[in-house]
């Protein structure tokens, strides 16, 4: 365990004077991993670069030889205040990037001006990268430690084959626990949030141990409450853990705490329940070993007045006294707290320690639960959404991680809908998938009965704990009557029912109210409406997996239906080049090379665009490739990606000749309507004179919910988790995401919305939730409920138990959009940054003026 002193730490020489690692035969093995066997020797590119720069710290060196390296790790930590950076407002966090040249690995420091490459998940593990400008830095808190700093980088594609078992050039990088290159911190943070324990400082080795209670004086919590102000020494406490909070990281650049963590335990004896706080280095030492239900003996603690703004969770037992005037503080030092886990077999009945009580409810009981009630649930996972993120505060670098899940328990046709935030249990949060047992405690009810459709879901609280298959054995709730019934019901589930489980994709929840006036009650006035011209800026500011909901005004001028069989295709994302010079476009390569240098502002070209902006251009497509895009695998028309600027569209036709010939004309508004598309006369008049046309109508494979297949559970789970901080070799040759069946058989629609001033237009995607195999899974979330258009989601299932044919439904949606010709509408858009310059913009709801 690392201490908290600020003394310089010993480290190896920056020169890394070790023998070069011999080159080995690069023989690929299953899983896309290269194992190496000693044979020949070759010079390490990393070694040559280090030797070139170590004599000139802080001076950028442009490398004459640039070779591809592999990214093996991207790790985040708090950057402390030090006279180090020329950046006027340095970011709160910085990143160490571990690379391999096939001979050595090296941990490098990413210049903070390139942090956005990580924010956008462009620089990530498993990609090929070319570094062409570097510098050398020294960590003045450690002896002789030299650091390779990345100042100019070209990020390429993910690699199918990754070399492993290459040693670190600098052996200090292999030491445990891992330490960041800069500053005095002893640990890394989780890559995408601060709540999850990450790295090898987090111990799990604490076990119950027999304890000799002779000569131990124990005080009750109620007695301590009455006397703590007049005591200097406190007798031991014997308590049971009833609740455990998620971790709180309170690190700041100007704070010198080595491990600035805090967590709360709610503990109780026969006289009441009180809060216990674990501080700083005690959290990595104990957090992962302390679980709800354990009995603890606490000695050498301190007591202080309770923090007035914190709200304690209520005891599950209404007869238990809640002690809210004091808090118990546990520290690694001053004084060093003594914590002992007492085995259950050593407990005595006369101690009268409270039992762990759960508040399980069934799904049928949830309908009657009041707002903000606290409950526990148990059931079977039927849907597991992707991991998403939301900012804790505006302009903050800190995010919450969460995902939506469905839990069924057999008592209702409806599932529990749960917004599952990270509970500092990454081993659970990142490894849940459909058709597994799932328990979640301390959930809060969120409801609004006046909204249509009614809003009802559960969300985690600060004390929520999650358990999945394999984590239940021996826990008290397995004897709970409700839990036992649900467990028996789960055992009756069949493989046929498993086929209806779903994982990942865009999930339009929570639903917005039926009127815009109700929607506006929950939005700040200054951020209620976003102009279409501002949408691009909103998208540029989003970080990886960050989701945001906005409202825009406009006129629906066109809609195009794209069937499922053509909706999952995705072109590879572009390679990105961050350079010391201004942005330039490589016409020869046919891909957009984005350039960036240390300390410069992020260029316009570096920002995430709609997938259609960069996927294909006529300059790089062969005739054969063009035909494939135009025809698709079944020779049916599919949309051709358009340039980002409307100026480049002038002179081109919106429809192909074959599409024009099949178009049916209607009278009155000169609209063109077929079963799969419509465009208004207004669009015909304005589309070639637009100032800008934003193309975000493409649907990436990640946006499509997939039918879950147990044999591919690891692959599917990884696809819809956040990008890992360290490279994980795949098992065998992994499949592609778009090979998995969509849970939305209807496909999607591309909707064009023209701004009210007829100067800017935006294409967005509309993905109706439609499943003919499972009527109950089709949610009432229509294209336009204010039109009383309900054929997509009939209020009651047809006698056949199946929904209408997808083509018929699609035709009705197209006609419904056509009925809005020249009508001013308000569109609610859900926007999510999918990483690697891919963005998802989905139409969630349409309002017409009230």
Curated annotation (Swiss-Prot):
Region: Disordered, residue numbers: 1-31, 575-612, 632-671
DNA-binding region: 228-331
Biased composition (Polar residues): 643-668
Entry's Gene Ontology BP terms: negative regulation of double-strand break repair via homologous recombination
One annotated GO molecular function: single-stranded DNA binding
Domain of life of the organism encoding this protein: Eukaryota
Gene3D superfamilies named in the record: Nucleic acid-binding proteins
GO cellular component terms attached to this protein's record: nuclear speck; replication fork
Pfam family name, one: RADX
Entry keywords, A to Z: Chromosome, DNA-binding
Key word Lipid metabolism present: no
Basic and acidic residues biased stretches: 590-608
Subcellular location: Chromosome
UniProt-listed InterPro entries: NA-bd_OB-fold (IPR012340), RADX (IPR040893)
Its biological purpose: Single-stranded DNA-binding protein recruited to replication forks to maintain genome stability. Prevents fork collapse by antagonizing the accumulation of RAD51 at forks to ensure the proper balance of fork remodeling and protection without interfering with the capacity of cells to complete homologous recombination of double-strand breaks.
Protein name, per record: RPA-related protein RADX
Phylogenetic placement of the source organism: Eukaryota, Metazoa, Chordata, Craniata, Vertebrata
